[in-house]
Regions:
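Cleavable N-terminal export/targeting peptides
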Residues: 1-35, 282
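A short, polar/proline- and glycine-enriched secondary-structure boundary/capping micro-motif
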Residues: 192-195, 239, 267-268
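Contiguous ligand/interfacial binding patches
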Residues: 205, 217, 231-248, 252, ...
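A short, compositionally biased micro-patch
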Residues: 23, 89-93, 174, 236, ...
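A mid-sequence, solvent-exposed acidic-amphipathic segment
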Residues: 182-234
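Transmembrane beta-barrel domains of Gram-negative outer membranes and organellar outer membranes
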Residues: 29-167, 175-177, 188-189, 215-225, ...
Length: 282
């Protein structure tokens, strides 16, 4: 995966809220060790401090139906979303590892929704690494742990909230030649406007879904080149198919360039290009 082993990162970008009652859409998330978009089973080593600097840039203008929903002018683009934050390995054991972290998120739909005032999102993960037998890597955790509680009434977000509080479980296994395959499930708090479970018409989407990914270091070309494709299911602001490639410029520094295709643009907005810079200390 992009972090850990190499370098690891993750940001879940969440959009949504409601134009009714003056509530505009929002964008939010937090970042454990990830693939391009979804969490991975990678966990930061003990005392390793990982810093991520991520940007998500919209590649198209929002359709007229999304203008009020996201609080932007007719025919406008959502502003880029920026995320920065640390993740730290906290357990000294070989067979069980854990990491904790937080992110500060600014821009995107958070700005018109007034949620730049609540930029802090937490994350944590605990799991077991893969061994050299048949036993896969296993990880469970949470991300997108926001500080502002939202509320929904009859399908309408009556109060914006950043507390998506996404919980998940994953298993992963490396296969010769093929690379690593990961599979899991997630759930979230549908009352958080950033989760976008309800659309502007009050139609309910999904508050849980599939997680799946493939990633591989392309050592045939260079040990510095890593690629991945991942999928987060569900009709909400987080559902997306993403792909990207990362280059390790140093032992502890990598840069990923990727693209996110959202499952439901009424809830998540237009697709995004992403640039993610990851640095490990020491």
């Amino acid at each position: 995966m992009k972090k850990s082993g190499r370098i690891t990162h993750r940001i879940g970008v969440a959009l949504a809220a409601f134009a009714l009652f003056g509530l505009t859409a929002t964008i939010a998330s937090a970042t454990p060790s990830t693939q391009v978009w979804i969490p991975s089973t990678d966990i930061q080593p003990y005392k390793t401090v990982h810093l991520n600097f991520d940007s998500y840039i919209r590649t198209g203008k929002e359709p007229a139906s999304n203008v009020g929903y996201f609080g932007i002018p007719d025919g406008g683009n959502l502003a880029p979303l920026y995320s920065v934050g640390p993740t730290v390995g906290v357990l000294p054991f070989e067979k069980i590892k854990a990491e904790v972290g937080f992110d500060l998120l600014y821009g995107g739909a958070n700005t018109p929704a007034g949620l730049d005032k609540y930029p802090l999102y937490g994350n944590f993960k605990i799991g077991m690494p893969e061994d050299n037998t048949w036993i896969p890597a296993v990880a469970v955790g949470m991300y997108g742990i926001g500080t502002k509680s939202g509320n929904v009434n009859n399908g309408v977000y009556t109060k914006t909230g950043t507390n998506a509080n996404i919980y998940y479980g994953l298993v992963a296994k490396n296969l010769p030649v093929v690379g690593r395959l990961s599979l899991g499930w997630y759930g979230l708090n549908k009352e958080a406007s950033v989760a976008g479970v309800y659309d502007r018409n009050g139609s309910e989407g999904d508050d849980n879904g599939l997680l799946a990914s493939w990633d591989r270091t392309l050592s045939e070309i260079s040990d510095k080149l890593w690629v991945a494709i991942d999928y987060q299911g569900g009709k909400n602001a987080y559902g997306a198919t993403s792909f990207g490639a990362s280059w390790a410029f140093a032992k502890n520094v990598s840069v990923l360039i990727g693209y996110d295709i959202y499952n439901n643009k009424d809830r998540a907005g237009q697709n995004t290009a992403t640039i993610q810079v990851d640095i490990n200390f020491p």
